Amino acid sequence: AYKLRPFTYIMNLKIRLTVMNFLEFAVWGAYLTSMGTFLFKAGYGSHIGFFYSIQGIVSLFMPGIMGIIADRWVQAQRLLSACHLFAAAFMIAAGLYGMTDGFSIGILFPLYSLSVAFYMPTLALSNSVAFNALNQAGMDTVKDFPPIRVFGTVGFIFTMWAVDFLGFQPTSQQFLLSGSLSVVLAVYSLTLPQVPVRSASSASGEKPTLVQALGLDAFRLFKRYDMAVFFIFSMLLGVSLQITNGFANPYITSFQSIPEY
């Protein structure tokens, strides 16, 4: 059983996890809804779909791989820091390269893809760090985590607006802002409560299979009608969301060139 912590410790912990969630999604909000405008203005409007689809592609395997590493070898808060550091390096490189005249999509896209590949696992890793810290403090994750997580949405909206107000939407400076925030979070993650590394064996003493380690056994839930319907409609919603993220901003900003508007 976990020991009950003093009120001041709990409040301090909540603030620390709130800052983590704010920064986690602020990194994403800096470019997710405005990157399409940058690509469109640069003459690469036909490639917008590739930039947004790569997020889903890397999400099929990178979170599972990083999850195995966090479970067996590297503490989650340290791996969270490392992932953000690599994501920042590639995102800043993409931002700087995008500022050059006549930049090639053949170079920008790999840099961006590598950054996204390291960023996507941090969504799950940050949750692991938060849940472990709350459990260690004897708190209820179902009750106490949602008010903390909502500040992730606040962070996303904050940087989304900041990019607009600073005039970064049609430029690659949005990548520089995202990368800079990743550096901040990489350093900050090292100050968060430690997450113990688990044994390589399961609770039953048996070594988990590769399918179990990657979480692929979760597909068994498709046998349940209600879960199958939920997953299918969630995927369809995700598709429409990415289309909106990629093309809504270029569509709206295109009216700037029409005198009537």
Question: What is each residue range found by the language model?
Answer:
Residues 6-11, 193-231:
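Juxtamembrane intracellular "pre-TM" segments in multi-pass secondary transporters
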Residues 11-60, 226-261:
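Helix-loop boundary and gating motifs at the non-cytosolic
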Residues 22, 90, 103-124, 235-236:
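Hydrophobic core of transmembrane alpha-helices in multi-pass small-molecule transporters
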Residues 61-75, 166-168:
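Helix-to-loop junctions at the C-terminal end of transmembrane segments
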Residues 71-85:
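Cytoplasmic membrane-interface "Motif A"-like loop-to-helix N-cap segments
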Residues 85-102:
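C-terminal ends and interior cores of transmembrane alpha-helices
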Residues 113-151:
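Cytoplasmic helix-loop-helix junction between adjacent transmembrane helices
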Residues 174-191:
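Symmetry-related core transmembrane helices of the 12-TM Major Facilitator Superfamily/SLC fold
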